[in-house]
Amino acid sequence: GTYKSEVFHSTEGLKEFVRYIDHSKEKLIDDVIHIVTEKQGIPVEVAMTYNTSYNESVYSYVNDIHTIEGGTHLAGFRRGLTRTLKKYADDSKLLEKAKVEITGDDFREGLTAVISIKVAEPQFEGQTKTKLGNNEVTGAVDQAVGEALGYYLEEHPKEAKAIVEKVILAASARVAARKAREQVQRKSPLTGGGLPGKLADCSSKDASICELFLVEGDSAGGTAKQGRDRTFQ
């Protein structure tokens, strides 16, 4: 028989991959930050950018194998990203107007990134063996991302400010959502609506001690309603 072959080539590699992932999203910054280096004998390549969405899209690879469950290279990337962005924001006094505590998740809202590393003897973990377990990788990726991203932020203050402002917005929205949930949970579920059917409310409004207590209603033998403690049942 005859063999059929096709050659696939991407001129810009991971940068083009990131643009492809983000093609339908509104850009926060125009640049795709591209990192190509080697740390501790481990080749590291990262392409990343930010969009205006609320989602994080990060894809990680080792020796061109898609590590669906992430692993130590993803942990190193996240650590380097958070540490570097926070340091830049602190040094630039951009977080002074933030009245909320910033978490790692806030730094990754709207982030799109592709991480690709090469490891001589990869150790895979997890049920599907798609999680990298090599501990030495974490520090290498952390260092690579920290150095290159730090340099980019210093050289591009406009883009850096846009990223930090989005981080602050993400943190503020997260805190506001949590407060709204807590307020709803504190309210009595029966407030304003009256009780359905023959249920009788208890006097306590503390949901943590209240319970639904079911007894036999009116029958030939009378009612067992008095058997409840009206304080919390």
Language-model features: where?
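GHKL-family ATPase ATP-binding module
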Residues: 1-233
